[in-house]
Regions:
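Short beta-strands and strand-loop turn motifs
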Residues: 52-55, 202-207
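Hydrophobic "anchor" residues on beta-strands that sit immediately upstream
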Residues: 49, 202, 231-232
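Glycine-rich loop-to-alpha-helix module at the N-terminal edge of alpha/beta enzyme cores
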Residues: 50-132
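Active-site core of PLP-dependent enzymes with the aminotransferase class I/II
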Residues: 185-192, 205-231
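PLP-dependent aspartate aminotransferase-fold enzymes
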Residues: 96-199
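Active-site-adjacent loop/helix segments that line or gate small-molecule/cofactor pockets in enzymes
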Residues: 2-39
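Residue-level signal for inorganic ion chemistry
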Residues: 74, 178, 203
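Active-site and channel-lining beta-strand-loop segments
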Residues: 33-53
């Protein structure tokens, strides 16, 4: 790329991504920037431009990028091996620490993504209750599974509880097992819960919707709904 400006180099990488990645991105949310490195709460793109990182990997970078202690621990473990498909002492100790720190976590199942966590949670709720339907709030994002990719964008059609798939390829049978409720509308939520109380296995909820935080009064009013199997 000799002779190219920083802007040209960045655009060339974006163009390459569009040829080899669906949508030109690793996920479903594209940004016209290619990150080169990160340190603490800041990242730099391929042109050297600096940004304050409010995303932090969508959650996992709790102590920021390239934290010295995290880097040192990761390098030490890489030298000993990374994936064993078996129990290991450090993983068990981490699970023990989580159980001690989280009052409602009696046991821990480690997964690689929020999508997997939601899938396991829905499966556990269905197994425990022997019911199939899950209540989800319109506009809430809970990963990329068929069950979660429903009614991500609030449409305010008033046609609750019908689920609207947000991707092609989602079977109708999956849609029929999801009940969609409006965010921050206690009256409608209560009505849906009463109507489907004998079918509901649980509800999937977040601390906030896609565009706003959950009002405390709404959270309190939902406390009597079916067991919340995912609260992220």
């Amino acid at each position: 790329m000799d002779g190219q400006s920083d802007t040209d180099i960045g655009q060339a990488i974006i163009d390459k991504a569009s040829r080899v990645l669906p949508g030109g991105t690793f996920g479903n949310f594209a940004a016209e920037v290619v990150i080169r490195e990160g340190k603490a709460g800041r990242v730099w793109d391929e042109t050297g431009k600096e940004y304050i990182d409010y995303l932090l990997g969508s959650g996992p970078m709790l102590v920021g990028h390239a934290h010295p202690e995290v880097t040192e621990a990761a390098q030490a473990q890489i030298a000993r091996g990374t994936t064993f498909f078996a129990n290991n002492r450090l993983g068990i100790e981490l699970a023990e620490a989580i159980v001690e720190a989280v009052p409602c976590a009696e046991q821990v199942r480690f997964v690689s993504s929020g999508t997997e966590a939601d899938l396991y949670a829905m499966r556990a709720a269905r197994a425990f209750t022997r019911r199939d339907k899950i209540l989800k709030f319109e506009g809430g994002y809970h990963g990329m599974s068929d069950y979660s990719l429903m009614s991500l964008a609030p449409r305010r059609s008033g046609n609750f509880p019908m689920a609207v798939p947000d991707s092609a390829g989602i079977p109708k049978s999956v849609r029929d097992d999801m009940i969609i409720a409006p965010f921050n509308d206690t009256e409608v939520v209560a009505s849906l819960v009463r109507e489907h109380k004998d079918e509901l296995a649980g509800s999937s909820s977040s601390r906030s919707s896609a565009s706003s935080r959950r009002p405390p009064a709404f959270s309190k009013s939902c406390a009597g709904s079916p067991p919340r199997m995912a609260c992220r």
